Amino acid sequence: MMQRVAKLSVQTASRVSFKTCTNNFSAATATKSTSSGSVPSFFTESTSTPLNQSKTNTSTLNKSSKLNNNLIDNIMYVYFIY
């Protein structure tokens, strides 16, 4: 999967192709359960709170799983475009 993603990032593809690629990538992202709820492992570190923020901010992020998915899509989208 990672090789395929890397290959797509070098091509001069349209924005739609990049978006499709990020959707596939975020769907495979695992989630971890914390005291404030379930968050994508992308944000989770074993020695600190997610994103180095307080648990109050983390629980705000967890209120909508759709918000979490869109956030991952946007982060990955920026990674592939820039």
From Swiss-Prot:
Q: Which segments show compositional bias classed as Polar residues?
A: 39-50
Residue ranges for the region (Disordered) are 29-64
What is the recorded name of this protein? Putative uncharacterized protein DDB_G0288657
Biased-composition ranges, Low complexity, are: 29-38, 51-64
